[in-house]
Amino acid sequence: MATATTKAKATERIKMRIRKGDTVQVIAGKDKGKTGAVLRTLPNENRVVVEGVNMRTRHEKPTQEGETGRIVTEEASLHASNVMLYSTDKKVASRVEIVVEKDGTKKRRLKKTGEVLD
């Protein structure tokens, strides 16, 4: 009896409403409650990198003669579902909705505060 080979299931890409430069709050995980600016989005992986959140340490070997190794601390990515857009004026996290203006342009708006993001 032959065994079937299994392929790694590709994650479905979700529509990300978070962009680089947005302020977000972490809503799940070890850094729950922390806020920070989005440094980078990884839409194909459904992940974001937030400033000062989910810090990881990495050991680097010396690359050149006479150089010493070092320990580097950097931000690791978080899943996009674990962060929520944050209003710095009202100090509250909120879901986001897409609003179509009369001229046909799309804007992002926080549901709790009504604040327009772009």
UniProtKB/Swiss-Prot annotation:
Function according to Swiss-Prot or TrEMBL: One of two assembly initiator proteins, it binds directly to the 5'-end of the 23S rRNA, where it nucleates assembly of the 50S subunit. One of the proteins that surrounds the polypeptide exit tunnel on the outside of the subunit.
For this protein, the record's InterPro entries field holds: KOW (IPR005824), Rib_uL2_dom2 (IPR014722), Ribosomal_uL24 (IPR003256), Ribosomal_uL24_CS (IPR005825), Ribosomal_uL24_KOW (IPR041988), Translation_prot_SH3-like_sf (IPR008991)
Q: According to the lineage, what is the superkingdom? A: Bacteria
Species source reads Synechococcus sp. (strain CC9605)
> Which gene is the coding source of this polypeptide chain?
rplX
Looking up SUPFAM superfamilies in the UniProt record yields: Translation proteins SH3-like domain
Q: What is an example of a Pfam family matching this protein?
A: ribosomal_L24
Give UniProt keywords alphabetically. Ribonucleoprotein, Ribosomal protein, RNA-binding, rRNA-binding
The GO terms this record gives for MF are: rRNA binding; structural constituent of ribosome
Self-association and partners: Part of the 50S ribosomal subunit.
Question: Gene Ontology terms, cellular component aspect?
Answer: ribonucleoprotein complex; ribosome
Q: Which family does it belong to?
A: Belongs to the universal ribosomal protein uL24 family.
- In its UniProt entry, what is this protein called? Large ribosomal subunit protein uL24
Q: Which GO terms describe its biological process?
A: translation
